[in-house]
A protein has these predicted regions:
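Single conserved hydrophobic/aromatic residue that forms the stacking wall/gate
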Residues: 1-7, 11, 210-211
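Short, solvent-exposed loop/turn segments at secondary-structure junctions
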Residues: 54-57, 78-81, 89, 132-136
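PAPS-dependent sulfotransferases, especially Golgi type II membrane carbohydrate sulfotransferases
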Residues: 16-22, 26-46, 86-128, 136-209
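Short N-terminal helix/helix-N-cap motif within the alpha/beta-hydrolase-1
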Residues: 58-61, 84, 139
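Structured core elements
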Residues: 49-51, 71-76, 127-131
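Conserved phosphate-donor/acceptor-positioning beta-strand/loop module used by diverse small-molecule
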Residues: 63-85
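Flexible, glycine/threonine-enriched loop-and-boundary segments that flank and lead into catalytic domains
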Residues: 34-69, 120
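ATP/adenylate-binding site constellation spanning eukaryotic-like Ser/Thr protein kinases
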Residues: 4-6, 69, 123
């Protein structure tokens, strides 16, 4: 919503994200204050909350400028698992790139390249969590994440599935149960049909096999 408002205020002959350099510190601060105010309906009185919209990675520069205290978490899965999960999910709106194997592979590759850029521009500001490591080394990974966020450990951090909080994303069912491994390799059952996805991922897929 803040992003849409920012686009409406674009200075003539300027486009997002270039226009950000022409906005005053006062305007940027107002964007941040507007975001905090408009998200209160979802977080209530909670001092911290998570905005996990899937396209947030595109706006990390904007987020950093209007919410300088925000913690950026880059949650990743194996590229094939991530893309297959998106491909089989019917989203309520948007995310049109998920409806084609080539398209979602290209989008994921662009995401990886952009995240590499953000990590160079904002060193130490992005904390990456690899799902495959999380499911096998859960509590140490949770503690590492809490350390990055400057938060104390609470039992609810590892018993998140007992929460009755509102979840407005496609993962609403997953967060109601303990972390599990069964979803990691679902894509392999359809491997013979995922050629266009593998081709679109290219080197990103190869590098993931090396690092995971």
């Amino acid at each position: 919503r803040v992003h849409r408002r920012q686009r409406q205020m674009c200075i003539r002959d300027s486009h997002y994200p270039e226009v950000m350099t022409k906005l005053s510190s006062k305007t940027l601060r107002e964007f941040g204050e507007t975001y905090i105010k408009e998200t209160m309906i979802h977080r209530g009185k909670a001092p911290f909350f998570i905005d996990k919209m899937p396209n947030n990675f595109r706006h990390i520069g904007l987020i950093h400028m209007i919410l300088p205290n925000a913690k950026i978490i880059d949650a990743r899965r194996h590229p094939m698992a991530c893309c297959f999960s998106g491909f089989k999910q019917l989203f309520a709106e948007g995310q049109e790139f998920t409806y084609g194997l080539k398209e979602i592979g290209t989008y994921y590759k662009d995401y990886v390249e952009l995240m590499d850029h953000w990590e160079c521009v904002f060193p130490g500001k992005v904390h990456r969590v690899q799902y495959e490591e999380l499911v096998t080394n859960f509590e140490p990974m949770v503690q590492r994440l809490l350390d990055f966020c400057g938060l104390e450990f609470e039992q609810s951090c590892v018993e998140f599935y007992k929460s009755d909080r509102s979840v407005r994303t496609p993962s609403s069912e997953q967060v109601r149960q303990p972390i599990y491994k069964s979803g990691m390799d679902q894509w392999r059952g359809f491997d013979a049909h995922l050629g266009p996805l593998k081709e679109a991922l290219g080197d990103v897929l190869l590098l993931s096999l090396i690092h995971i």
